[in-house]
Amino acid sequence: LEAIGRVCKKHHLLFVVDASQTAGVFPIQMDSMNIDVLCFTGHKSLMGPQGTGGMCVRKGVRIRPLLVGGSGIDSYSKIHPQVMPTALEAGTLNAHGIAGLSAALDFIKKVTPAVIRQREEELTRRFVSQIKSIPGVKLYGNYEQFPRAPILSLNILDYDSGEIADVLAQDYGIMTRAG
């Protein structure tokens, strides 16, 4: 990220990073990496509820809201608030989701990102070593290189990915996304 950030800064390009798989487990330094906007979802590596996420925006970067209205801050105004972050928060905030995300962040701080990353690496190595022994399994990518996010891409010959995802979830408690 640092190398890409340097190139973006040199050429005055906006550097937007999707940290959905890594936020909370891998260190991300917006300043030293020259990241202008850091986006993340709460339900993946941050272990929060679905429907949560966020965006860290470097001071001076202007973003237009996708939706406006119903801010709840100034309900009688006919103009949507212009002050950040309220300018990007149309509608009622997901207070329950935000509370759940806060609890997840407390858990990550308590356990530490390094311990979580180590456990994810152990599970990834174990899964890869076992899945390789199944005939017809095709793994995509280098699974010997760590640190890495615990994301795997694979196909199983003659099987629909949706069926495989269902079996892994129901029979083994392994969460996947088919497709």
List each language-model region with its residue ranges:
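Pyridoxal 5′-phosphate
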Residues: 1-179
